[in-house]
Amino acid sequence: MNDLRSYDLYTSLVSHSDSITSASNTLTEGTAIALSTALLHPLDSILTRLQVRYASQHHNKKKDNRTRTRKPLDVLGDIVDLAAENVKDAEGRAVLYAGLREAICKQTAENMLVPAVYAALHARRLNLGRTAGNELLLSLVSMAFVKLFTEPLGTIMVRRQVTGSGTRCVVDDILRQKGVGGLWSAYGATLVLCVRSCVLPVVYLALRRRLGMKRGGLLGMLVLRAIAESVVYRLAVMQVCARAGVKAVGNGSKLGSTYTNDYTICVLMVCLGLLLEVIRTLSSQGVTTVTSDVVTVAMMRLSAVMLYMLEPFLLSEQAITDSVRENVDAGASQPLLDDAKYMNNAVKRAISIVNRGIGLASHGRDDVAVAELVGDYVEDGPEDG
């Protein structure tokens, strides 16, 4: 009997700790994504607007049969000039943060839903074996499914970054120009870019094996990522232009010849994009470290307050004794009385667990402490038999 009670009580306490810890981890991750996205959104907005501007200028130059290769200093100068124009007044600074709400929602949803969908598909197995190809297929399906729902957010975000308009105006323009399907105008390019994201780690591991590299460094991964980004850069620009509603390729042009003389832009934009992603990752990790303890303490205090609200409703041992003696025959009262005392004592000590924050302070659960406390409950429990 004691073993059964110990298991039930331990399971309930661990479940309580797991639920609070899971909520704390989710809140921390969401906070980190939101802050890192807000920190780097102005630079991302500037790069997006420059990509659209260069694509439009290239399309106009094709009509005029004139070409010109931009130098890195020209691109950097355009970035500085565009940033200076928007920093001068309040309206310009607001334009830099246009689309921030959609960016945060999109990043948060993708970072949390893609692993969840992948885990759900993996749990169902789908009659597939655990091979690299099947794992890659599940990753692609997960990303494609989630991005099907987040693509409208990406379209609205880019439109707002380019035009600086509000969400309602942007949505009205899209619906008036292309209908509801306009919200998914760049979904095809998004799917191809999903393939890049899923295949890149596999290619990196294959190259490591091929070259006999025992250790894979960050530099090697960045070089491979830069090569992959350079290959699909034109497609990435096409995605941005489709979302922005800007025509970047003239009639009869092929995707491969869109930026024949703009490789300088390609290389610089790839480097800036990688820098942006590295900064976002580092800032996200830093924010996670800073906010984890704060969120944990907040969740712990919330749990403590909830249990404190329930504590006055706990019956005292004397009230339990009187109630059992009034409603149960004398022959059966003692076992029920012992059980009632035991459960009342267990609930009170459970409140003590939450107040001390067992298992929450380190974003995990202290199984040993919980087990020891459950052992105390069992020792205080009624004797068998």
Swiss-Prot record:
PROSITE patterns tied to this protein: SOLCAR
Annotated Gene Ontology cellular component terms: mitochondrial inner membrane
Pfam families attached to this UniProt entry: Mito_carr
Domain of life: Eukaryota
Transmembrane annotation, as ranges: 30-47, 132-150, 184-207, 263-279, 294-310
One GO MF term: ADP transmembrane transporter activity
Record-linked Gene3D superfamilies: Mitochondrial carrier domain
Keywords linked to the UniProt accession: Membrane, Mitochondrion, Mitochondrion inner membrane, Repeat, Transmembrane, Transmembrane helix, Transport
Major subcellular site: mitochondrion
Membrane topology: Multi-pass membrane protein
Compartment list: Mitochondrion inner membrane
Each Solcar repeat, start to end: 24-124, 130-210
Record-stated family: Belongs to the mitochondrial carrier (TC 2.A.29) family.
Function: May function as a mitochondrial transporter.
Protein name, per record: Putative mitochondrial carrier protein TRV_02148.2
Lineage of origin: Eukaryota, Fungi, Dikarya, Ascomycota, Pezizomycotina
